[in-house]
Amino acid sequence: MEYEVVIGLEVHAELATKSKIFCSCTTEFGGEPNTHCCPICTGMPGVLPVLNKKAVEYAIMAGLATNCQIARYSKQDRKNYFYPDLPKAYQISQYDLPLCYNGYIDIEVNGQKKRIGIKRIHIEEDAGKLLHDQWEEGSLVDFNRCGVPLIEIVTEPDLRSSEETRIFLEKLKAILQYTGVSDCKMQEGSLRVDVNLSVRPKGSKEFGTRTEMKNLNSFRSVVRAIEYEAKRQIEVLESGGVVVQETRRWDEAKGITLSMRTKEEAHDYRYFPEPDLPPIIVDDNWIEEIRKRIPELPDQKKERYIKEYGLPEYDAGVLTSSNAIANYFEECIKYTQNIKAASNWMMGEIMRILNDRGLEPEEIVNIKIRPNQLASLINLVDNKTISNTIAKQVFEEMFETGKDPEVIVKEKGLVQITDRNVILEAVKQAIANNPKSVEDYKNGKDKAFGFLVGQVMKITKGKANPQLVNEILREELEKI
């Protein structure tokens, strides 16, 4: 029997506010444990929360950017459960009246557009963090994260594969970063993904029993976990078993999901309206004011790159997939007329060094090559000061040292040879040293010409102007 995978996501994104959702404590990441908290964060008796207006605005902005309806009236609710990192024994969240609902994000899979529904976006506070490796006798609790504002983005069960899920998450991450709603640093926990997954016979309309997967701290983990869990559930069904509705933990090292606990239902949390906070009232003027602050989003920027810069759709898609990459590219083309070359360098060498060093796209801001330096390198090639081959060598040194390309070219004597007489001598030497290749060329073997060009470049240490090498070499070969 052929099965279909059905996937829905719950994505938690930390909002980019400077202070927490119900108090003035900082949201800065990385402080000493329990130094960024106060009686409100830790739920001491007698304290009252005050809602951070900026958190609401960021949530509305996320809703507008994902085509959601914005609720004019919503409220906050207490979600009751016990866990050591939850000092109040309840989390302030939203239950039946979320701030944003009925949205969507369009993605492209194998050249086909697909719409993924956003069921709701609601605001809530984060819990603390358990530290398991700092005390031999047990676990410790760090309350710094308590009260950090989150949005939870809940999708409809519209995703059908790990690939669709990855593409959707990359698009969502880009939208949140473009709008400034969240920095989405997964390594710092500011973007966390829970995956709800079930399988059903292909063609069936009924949903299977779902499991929820947690501890997914990278998109690669999400993809691997989906592929493993789908296979596991299919094997259970085909062996006559029953899939248990439960929460499962992804074990990155072993590449498997492990049972954590049975899956809770809403009634298990005994939700009730938060008595210490008034309802959230949002009027049209406030929504329009926030809408005006939304910058150009990835899809809009992609269309502009295609129309304004004449870039291929694929290139435009890659360059706009991350706000940091797009900003780097736009800064680069302020200093060079050759937009296509800038795109090629970004798509080729820049992406390569990010991938080779395991850097996220947003970490492009930390590399030593500045956008204006990349533009200078492009200009050196365009004005024939250096060849493309030499430019790649210069690029590597720029990445390691941060030096300007002009400085590297001067220090290493890499200026392109354009003197015809010098190139002619190198051509004659290459011809004299490789009679077999000359004979092959005369017999119609085109590859022999490429080999001879390579020999000339080797003699000139890659510094000869390639166009002149081709021209002079052909002239000399015709004389033979």
From Swiss-Prot:
It comes from the Bacteria. One of its GO terms (biological process) is glutaminyl-tRNAGln biosynthesis via transamidation. SUPFAM superfamilies: GatB/YqeY motif (SSF89095), Glutamine synthetase/guanido kinase (SSF55931). InterPro entries: Asn/Gln-tRNA_amidoTrfase_suB/E (IPR017959), Asn/Gln-tRNA_Trfase_suB/E_cat (IPR006075), Asn/Gln_amidotransferase (IPR018027), Asn/Gln_tRNA_amidoTrase-B-like (IPR003789), GatB (IPR004413), GatB_C_1 (IPR042114), GatB_Yqey_C_2 (IPR023168), Gln-tRNA_amidoTrfase_suB_CS (IPR017958). Belongs to the GatB/GatE family. GatB subfamily. PANTHER family: GLUTAMYL-TRNA GLN AMIDOTRANSFERASE SUBUNIT B MITOCHONDRIAL AND PROKARYOTIC PET112-RELATED, GLUTAMYL-TRNA(GLN) AMIDOTRANSFERASE SUBUNIT B, MITOCHONDRIAL. Allows the formation of correctly charged Asn-tRNA(Asn) or Gln-tRNA(Gln) through the transamidation of misacylated Asp-tRNA(Asn) or Glu-tRNA(Gln) in organisms which lack either or both of asparaginyl-tRNA or glutaminyl-tRNA synthetases. The reaction takes place in the presence of glutamine and ATP through an activated phospho-Asp-tRNA(Asn) or phospho-Glu-tRNA(Gln). This is Aspartyl/glutamyl-tRNA(Asn/Gln) amidotransferase subunit B. It comes from Caldicellulosiruptor saccharolyticus (strain ATCC 43494 / DSM 8903 / Tp8T 6331). The lineage of its organism: Bacteria, Bacillati, Bacillota, Bacillota incertae sedis, Caldicellulosiruptorales. The gene is gatB.
